[in-house]
């Protein structure tokens, strides 16, 4: 049974490899994997999308065992930096979509509750990212100011 106020809804998903070792079928060197990651990022893919593409199209289950570095660390080393962490950005986009829906359908109470849940997650993540230093201490979640991220 799914956990309440989470978006999994009991769906089955793929499982990460149990032992993060380099599989025997991988033909790529660590340098080639790094180049693939950087190339995909420059083409506009988010880190999670890069991982999916590497898994599905190149047969690379995990980047870290091969390169010894996390995918986002590789991107930082090559000067590719994201304004906001990806999970926070996706939640903000979801909240903005719900707000747009509520402008057209103001009596949709289920969506209003959904917006409350999403914004609660946003506030928890903002607190966490401020604490670990990924967001500046003066960052404030403001839907109107962040509306440019809805694209």
From Swiss-Prot:
GO terms for cellular component: cytosolic small ribosomal subunit. InterPro entries: Ribosomal_uS15, Ribosomal_uS15_arc_euk, Ribosomal_uS15_N, uS15_NS1_RNA-bd_sf. The keyword Electron transport does not apply. GO terms for biological process: translation. Pfam families: Ribosomal_S13_N, Ribosomal_S15. It comes from the Archaea. GO terms for molecular function: small ribosomal subunit rRNA binding; structural constituent of ribosome. Residues 1-20 are annotated as: Disordered. Keywords: Ribonucleoprotein, Ribosomal protein. Residues 1-16 have a biased composition (Basic residues). NCBIfam families: PRK08561.1. Part of the 30S ribosomal subunit. PANTHER family: RIBOSOMAL PROTEIN S15P/S13E, SMALL RIBOSOMAL SUBUNIT PROTEIN US15. Belongs to the universal ribosomal protein uS15 family. This is Small ribosomal subunit protein uS15.
């Amino acid at each position: 049974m799914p956990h309440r106020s989470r978006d999994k809804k009991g769906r089955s998903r793929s499982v990460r490899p149990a032992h993060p070792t380099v599989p025997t079928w991988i033909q790529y060197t660590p340098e080639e994997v790094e180049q693939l990651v950087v190339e995909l990022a420059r083409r506009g893919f988010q880190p999670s999308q890069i991982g999916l593409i590497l898994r599905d199209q190149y047969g690379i289950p995990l980047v870290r065992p091969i390169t010894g570095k996390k995918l986002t660390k590789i991107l930082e080393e090559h000067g590719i930096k994201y304004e906001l962490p990806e999970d926070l950005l996706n939640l903000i986009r979801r909240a903005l979509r719900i707000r747009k829906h509520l402008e057209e359908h103001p009596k949709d109470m289920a969506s209003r509750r959904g917006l409350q849940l999403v914004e609660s997650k946003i506030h928890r993540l903002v607190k966490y990212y401020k604490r670990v230093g990924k967001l500046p201490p003066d960052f404030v979640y403001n839907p109107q100011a962040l509306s440019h991220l809805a694209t």
